[in-house]
Amino acid sequence: MKYFVSLVIVAAFTIISVGTSPQNVGEPIMHFSGNTSGANPQSSLIEVGNTGILYGVTRNGGNTSDDLGVIYRIDTTLNNTFTVVHQFTDITGCHPISSLVFANDLSLFGSTIRCSQFGYGNIFRYNLSNHIFNVIYEFADIANPNSLFLDNDSGLLYGTADVGSSTFYGSVFTIDVKHEIPSTTFKQLFSFNYGTGAFPSNLILVNNSLYINTQIFGQYGAGTLIKMDRDGENAKLVYAFGRDKALGCCPWGQLVLVADEQQQYLYGTTMGAADCPSTIYRVGLTMMTNQIELVATFNETTVGSAPYDGLIQSVNPSLSFGVTSQGGINNHGTFFRVNVSGDGSLEKLFDFPSDDMFGYQTQGGLVEVGNNVFYGTANLGGKYGFGTVYKITIS
């Protein structure tokens, strides 16, 4: 079934207007069954180069009785053909929740949060050339790895985990995945505390500096944005969320680098809280270094709220896109875009339908395949109730 919606411009900086445009089309292209095909995808899909071939993971499901998750492949050039390429086990790790990352050597790297030798998950590699799965590193005293960033030039894989070896507030780690498989080069770079924030959710490497957002705690209890050298030294607080609640609380989604002729910006999103809205913010990295400003505020009943996985940069460099996990007309979330090179206008493009068949509770973000065609995952709903992969085409 295909679903249609008209575009609504909801808010941007100080601009508020409503209008319509030709209809945008959304449809579920895969219904997870809860068994062999997997269940509950909680992360984004990635595209291998510009091939139209996508890979993703499900947290649960698979052909084992313990519902340990799978790696799957979707070929958008062959009528969205779906294939499971790996079934997780107690030995190979289980319950992957972070998005895969693509390496120049035609490998995918990912992480699991449970199972493996010590029960705390692992880092793994799936080779796209020979289809071999290898465990790279098994966590022994760090738990719940939840985001990864690969620097292809150095071969260093960076990541965050909810629990660090010395604290329960989380950590940042790195491992060399280019020169040794399995790797013995694992290193914890930084352990969070109450003041620096807890539960780091995403990180990015820009100009030899790591930027990491944390979901809670910090000076005002609502999360932080932290900057540090790529070796974990010289950690500095960029911003403590909650001081100005209009800027949002609880930053959660991935950080996106946007550059123009004069300035580099990091764009991020906040989930919001009871007395604090979901927002889009940006931080200047060159001119006006580390100055944070509000880009847009979400309205739950119109444009949606809780953009779980943040933004993606579009083929069109002036635009970023994302999905919300709540709100909108049907309270199942929305698909939106924001103008990152102009007035910051925030536009709702699609409401997730109310009938559950499309899928809902979007914890993963989007991938743009071609121009104006987007694929994403929903954690719940669909024909069997275990989530979907959906496609949205905008006009």
Features from the language model and the residues they span:
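Positively charged n-region of N-terminal signal peptides that target proteins for export
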Residues: 1-4
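Extracellular beta-propeller repeat domains
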Residues: 18-395
